[in-house]
Swiss-Prot record:
Family statement: Belongs to the PsbX family. Type 1 subfamily.
Known function: Involved in the binding and/or turnover of quinones at the Q(B) site of photosystem II (PSII). PSII is a light-driven water plastoquinone oxidoreductase, using light energy to abstract electrons from H(2)O, generating a proton gradient subsequently used for ATP formation.
The protein's name: Photosystem II reaction center protein X
Species assigned in the record: Microcystis aeruginosa (strain NIES-843 / IAM M-2473)
GO CC, alphabetical: photosystem II; plasma membrane-derived thylakoid membrane
Lineage, opening ranks: Bacteria, Bacillati, Cyanobacteriota, Cyanophyceae, Oscillatoriophycideae
Signal peptide as annotated in the record: none
GO term, biological process aspect, one: photosynthesis
Length: 39
C-alpha cells in the first residue's frame, strides 16, 4: 500500500467518523426528546 493510498483511506475513515458520529448522537438525542415530548 502506498502512503498516498493510506492517507486517502484514513481521510475516508475520518470523514465518515466526523459525519456519522454527530449524526448518530443527534438521532439518539432527537428520538429520546421526541419520546419524552409525546407522552
Amino acid at each position: 500500500m502506498t502512503p498516498s493510498l493510506a492517507n486517502f483511506l484514513w481521510s475516508l475513515v475520518l470523514g465518515a467518523a466526523i459525519v456519522l458520529i454527530p449524526a448518530t448522537i443527534g438521532l439518539i438525542f432527537i428520538s429520546q426528546y421526541d419520546k419524552i415530548k409525546r407522552t
